[in-house]
Amino acid sequence: FIVVPLSINLVKEKSQGTSVRVRVSPTPYYIHILGKTFTYLIICVIQFLLMVAVGIWLFPLMDLPQFDVSGKMFHLLIVTLFAGLAAIGFGVLIGTMSNTQEQSAPFGATSVVVLAAIGGIWVPVFLMPEFMQKIAQFSPMNWGLNAYYDIILRNSGISEIAKELIFLFLFYIAMVTISLLYERKQNSV
């Protein structure tokens, strides 16, 4: 839920001249990106907490079983932080490489839908053809989904989901690094 607004925000900064002021300030550009990361990570956590609240308090009102997070909330928050980082990194990349909101919004939304489909959000990975199952292993959405599954369904701890968390963090680092290199190249001309 964070990729599109973040990428649009970065494009708006370019069109309104804010990014020029950021570049001429004595603060390195990566500090600006870290500030965005922190801000949007808080938004990701708030979104997660709202979804959990719906599962805990609204599900029973609709005759659905209550979402049981007892003893799992800390682990779920850790996954949310890492999944949020991956989404933020992707949003930063799209916002950095886009020149207009008309580019960033549809590309961000479409790419998130495609990554969700590939990652097993729509169709469980085990139901996919074998070649798609192999492709799903490279989707950040699949890493996050598997980490959530492991905690919610298998009562796993952090050590059991460490691989997924590392992949999500490395994805964030890769996206931000590409964004910073692209930004540097664009502004050195």
Task: Locate each region found by the language model.
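Transmembrane helix-loop junction
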Residues: 12, 56, 60, 95-96, ...
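Short helix-loop-helix connector
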Residues: 23, 27, 98, 136-139
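Alpha-helical transmembrane segments and their short interhelical loops
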Residues: 29, 33-106, 113, 159-163, ...
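Helix-loop-helix units of permease transmembrane domains in multi-pass membrane transporters
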Residues: 9-41
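Long, hydrophobic alpha-helical segments
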Residues: 1-7
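Junction motif at the cytosolic side of a transmembrane helix
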Residues: 10-11, 93, 97, 167-189
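Membrane-interfacial helix-loop-helix junctions in multi-pass membrane proteins
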Residues: 120-174
